[in-house]
């Protein structure tokens, strides 16, 4: 399966909001990430049943700027979206068993996220 999201990738963790809930701090994703996640929904296909068997996840991130970014945070945001929008049942190691080939590159004119899911 191949999914292309033609939007500049955004991480989930770098600029979160801390709110108090019943006396305990809770970290919420930043507004830019929340907007990114909503925009991405239209590019993620709907599956009848989420994938629940081992896969290799390969993601190519093409960033709009050369600013340093954390590939781990990008990958976590992508996995969370794939679970939220019903592509993956979960993002634990029994389903996402490898992430071979994931990379970050620069493409000012065409920032995007290319997701490749291959069943093992």
What are these regions (language model features)?
Residues 1-120:
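Acidic, proline/glycine-enriched N-terminal capping motif
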């Amino acid at each position: 399966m191949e999914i292309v999201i033609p939007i500049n990738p955004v991480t989930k963790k770098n600029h979160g909001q801390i709110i108090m809930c019943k006396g305990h701090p809770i970290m919420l994703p930043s507004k830019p990430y929340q907007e990114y996640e909503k925009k991405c929904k239209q590019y993620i296909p709907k599956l009848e049943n989420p994938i629940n068997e081992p896969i290799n996840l390969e993601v190519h991130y093409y960033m709009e700027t050369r600013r340093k970014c954390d590939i781990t945070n990008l990958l976590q945001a992508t996995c969370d979206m794939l679970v939220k929008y019903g592509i993956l049942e979960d993002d634990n190691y029994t389903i996402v068993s490898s992430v071979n080939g994931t990379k970050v590159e620069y493409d000012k004119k065409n920032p995007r996220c290319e997701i490749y899911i291959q069943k093992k």
